[in-house]
Every structure is written in C-alpha cells, then in structure tokens.
UniProtKB/Swiss-Prot annotation:
Compartment(s): Mitochondrion inner membrane
Name of the molecule in the record: Mitochondrial adenyl nucleotide antiporter SLC25A24
One example GO MF annotation: ATP:phosphate antiporter activity
SUPFAM superfamilies noted in UniProt: EF-hand, Mitochondrial carrier
Region (C-terminal transmembrane transporter domain): 174-475
Subunit structure: Monomer.
Activity regulation info: Activated by an increase in cytosolic calcium levels that induce a conformational change of the N-terminal regulatory domain, uncapping the channel and allowing transport. Inhibited by bathophenanthroline, mersalyl, p-hydroxymercuribenzoate, bromcresol purple and tannic acid.
Modification N6-succinyllysine occurs at: K318, K435
Family statement: Belongs to the mitochondrial carrier (TC 2.A.29) family.
Organism of provenance: Mus musculus
Placement of Solcar repeats on the sequence: 192-276, 284-369, 381-469
Any GO BP: cellular response to calcium ion
List of residues binding Ca(2+) 4: D135, D137, T139, T141, E146
Residues in compartment: Mitochondrial matrix: 216-250, 308-343, 405-443
Length: 475
C-alpha cells in the first residue's frame, strides 16, 4: 500500500520540497468519501485504513487537534494541505537527524547509533527489522521518500517521539513505590504535558490501589503474622469477621494519600540526579537512568517513609485501635518516639536496587525479544505488548526484592505484635529462616501477584481516560 501511495499520490521522483497542491488534492478526494469537500474524523479513519497507511496510537485525534485550525471538527482542503506540508517539514528534520553521513539514506548502523544516544540499545539485527517495516523497495536502506510515505499520517514529529514507542512507562500502577520515574521530553516540560501526565498517573494509581486494597491488606497481614495456616480465603474470612467488609480497606487511605508527595519528590529528585550524572546536552543512557531513578526513589522514600509505617500499622490494627491516620501517628510518637517512623528503613532502601535493576533488565530483555521476533510490520509494539512487558518486568522486580519488603513490613509492625522481640534487619532474617524456612521470606506473595493483573488493567484504563480529560496529547 505504501507503493500505491507513492505512485498514486506522491511522485517517486519527488524533490525534497513540498508536493504540488494537485497531489494533495488527489489524496484529499480519496479520503473525502461522501464528496462534501471536507473530511471528518470518521472518513479519515476509514480512508486511511482502506489505503493501508500505518497509523500511530490515536493518530487521527492528534491530526485533527493540529490540523483543524477553525475547530469545526472537519478538515477542509486548505487545512489538510497545510497540515501535510508542516508535518513533512518536521519529518524531514527527523530524517536528517538519523542520516548521520548525509547520504540521503538511513542505514541500520545509523538507527543503532541514534537510539543509543537516546538511551535505547538495540542490535544491528534489530535495527534491520525496524528498517524492514519502512523499507518498501527491499534495499535495506530507507530514503526520504520511503520515510515520508511511512510517517505521512503518523503524527510523530521527531525521532525522540518515534522512539518513545518503547518508553518504559505506560501509566500502570501495581502498588509499589520503587519504580523508576517517567521520562519527559523538553517539549512536554515546556508545554505543561508533564504535570498532566503525572496527575493522570496519580489518579490512576489511587483508583487502582483502592480497587485492589483488600489483596494488599491481606498481603501485609500474611507478612506480619507469618502463619503457615493463614491462607487467602482464611485471611479474608478472619479480617471480615474481626472488622466487617470495610476493614478490608484499612490502611488504604494512607496508601493513596502518599502518592502525591512521593511522585512530586521522586520527579524533582530524578531531574536533579540526571543533571548531576550527565553533561549538558548529553542523552541519558540506561545505566544513568537506573542510577538516577534509584537515587530518586531513595530520596522520595526518605521523605514519605513515615506514611509507609502508618499504612502498615493501620493495616494490621484491630477495630477501634486507632481513630485514624492522625490518631495512629500520635500514638506512635507518644509511646515509641520519632524513630519508630523509620523502622524498616534500611531494608526498604536496599530493596530499591534489585527491584529497579531487575525491572529495567527484564524490560530490556522483553523489548529485545519482541524486536527480534515480531517487529516485522510496524515500529510500534502496541498497547498490549507495552502493558505486558511493563507488568512482567515489575513483577520480576517484586519477586527479587520481596524478602527485603517482608522484613521491612515486619520491622514496621513488630511493636504491635504481642510477645514479638524487637529485632534488627539481620536478626529478623535469621529468625524467619530458622522458624519458617526460606519460604517464610515469601509469605504473602500470592495475594501480591494476584493484584497485578487487575491493578494493571484498572490503572491503564483510568490513566488513558484521565489523559483525555486533562487534554494530554496522544502519542
């Protein structure tokens, strides 16, 4: 179909200047299915699909947002032609940024080099597969005509936006606080898109955590009490019997409230650490991103850690033990002192490294596997691939850091367990292994894994809807 597009609409011997209006008019007429002189979004969707022209996610909406100058919900010919001319200019700049040797063609080695500068590392073979999806004449290089035809109606405007197909962020929240922060481009920062995306992610996280709160509380109860006899159904039955259905959400308020300060501190710290680790104008590589993200996570955890302790104390509390978040904080301060708000802080910090490291490593592995085996028809992996990769890599990160998370939770709550000795991190590890075996370090991991799929689905749906509500430009 791309060959058809070039032959029918865009001449093969086209110069690098904008196409003559008559060529745009031919394409416009092909899209104007009812012949009324304007193209609405339905006609654009149907027309482009029938022509086999590749589209990015929500491409039609973005084309209309940019091209519909008079905001009447339709594109007339002048708006249509102006959009294509402006878009081709931007795609020309993207093409030149990839064409390192200025020979008018993009080769696999240039793809590898450009992506490395953006912190995305792929092999020459993977670059060839990407080029195959764009290369229409089988030369294993992409010239300007092929590049323009492929991205003609894909509203990406620069190479960074193209690469963000594989940005390790999909707005999912599985309830953990150790993930590396999102990456935002300079354009997103200047336009204010960054805070809208963070807000959308925060709302998605709040809804997701609230929806899966019963499983999260069950996990905490199993971590703290460590009884082999407490299974999932027995745990739920015990919680409902003790405090009713509402008790299943005990501690969720704190878990939701801490999203805002944690996200804000993590984002600010991440930007500062990136500046420290990279020179001005230098792109952030995977290793620098890992270090910056880990340090930002540690900074955010230091700031909001008292809320982590409050969440655990409220989750394991009996009905009427605390009057609320403030009452819980007041009791802890009165009876245990300020230091109690940082119990379990060390294992929590230590857990950041294996979590963030394995999360990134598994994501890169899954990305490479997809590029090697499935990247034949499009450079865009699609929503389901990104969600699956993100969820699986986060789950692997959780699995690696879970023993530290369990010890952290027990240290936070051990003052509330009658007859329990106040042990250090090492002492707790030794006690758990000696009394419960190595499997004791993974107590509660089943409900933790059970909440991953619903958390991913709920947070993604809410995130996408919130982005639309807040006017975040779709990629």
């Amino acid at each position: 179909m791309l060959r058809w597009l070039r032959a029918f609409v865009l001449p093969t011997a086209a110069c690098h200047d904008a196409e003559p209006p008559t060529r745009y008019e031919t394409l416009f007429r092909a899209l104007d299915r009812n012949g009324d002189g304007v193209v609405d979004i339905g006609e654009l969707q149907q027309g482009l699909q029938s022509l086999g022209i590749p589209l990015g996610q929500d491409a039609e909406e973005k084309i209309f947002t940019t091209g519909d100058v008079n905001k009447d919900g339709k594109l007339d010919f002048e708006e249509f032609m102006k959009y294509l001319k402006d878009h081709e200019k931007k795609m020309k700049l993207a093409f030149k940024s990839l064409d390192k040797n200025n020979d008018g063609k993009i080769e696999p080695s240039e793809i590898v080099q450009s992506l490395q500068m953006l912190g995305l590392h792929i092999s020459e073979k993977q670059a060839e597969l990407i080029l195959q999806s764009i290369d229409s004449d089988g030369t294993m290089t992409v010239d300007w005509n092929e590049w323009r035809d492929y991205f003609l109606f894909n509203p990406v405007t620069d190479i960074e936006e193209i690469i963000r197909f594989w940005k390790h962020s999909t707005g999912i929240d599985i309830g953990d606080s150790l993930t590396i922060p999102d990456e935002f481009t300079e354009d997103e920062k200047k336009s204010g898109q960054w805070w809208r995306q963070l807000l959308a992610g925060g709302v998605a996280g709040a809804v997701s955590r609230t929806s899966t709160a019963p499983l999260d509380r069950l996990k905490v109860m199993m971590q703290v009490h460590g009884s082999k006899s407490m299974n999932i159904f027995g745990g739920f039955r015990q919680m409902v019997k003790e405090g009713g259905i509402r008790s299943l959400w005990r501690g969720n308020g704190t878990n939701v409230i801490k999203i805002a300060p944690e996200t804000a501190v993590k984002f600010w710290a991440y930007e500062q650490y990136k500046k420290l680790l990279t020179e001005e104008g230098q792109k952030l590589g995977t290793f620098e991103r890992f270090i910056s993200g880990s340090m930002a996570g540690a900074t955010a955890q230091t700031f909001i850690y008292p809320m982590e302790v409050l969440k655990t104390r409220l989750a394991v509390a009996k009905t009427g033990q605390y009057s609320g978040i403030y009452g819980c904080a007041k009791k802890i301060l009165k009876h245990e002192g300020f230091g109690a708000f940082y119990k379990g802080y060390i294992p929590n910090l230590l857990g950041i490294i294996p979590y963030a490291g394995i999360d990134l490593a598994v994501y890169e592995l899954l990305k490479s596997y997809w590029l090697d085996n499935f990247a034949k028809d499009s450079v865009n992996p699609g929503v389901m691939v990104l969600l699956s990769c993100g969820a699986l890599s986060s789950t692997c990160g959780q699995l690696a850091s879970y023993p530290l998370a369990l010890v952290r939770t027990r240290m936070q709550a051990q003052a509330t367990v009658e007859g329990a000795p106040q042990l250090s991190m090492v002492g707790l590890f030794q006690r758990i292994v000696s009394k419960e075996g190595v499997s004791g370090l993974y107590r509660g991991i089943t409900p933790n894994f059970m909440k991953v799929l619903p958390a991913v689905g709920i947070s993604y749906v809410v995130y996408e809807n919130m982005k639309q509500t807040l006017g975040v430009a779709q990629k």
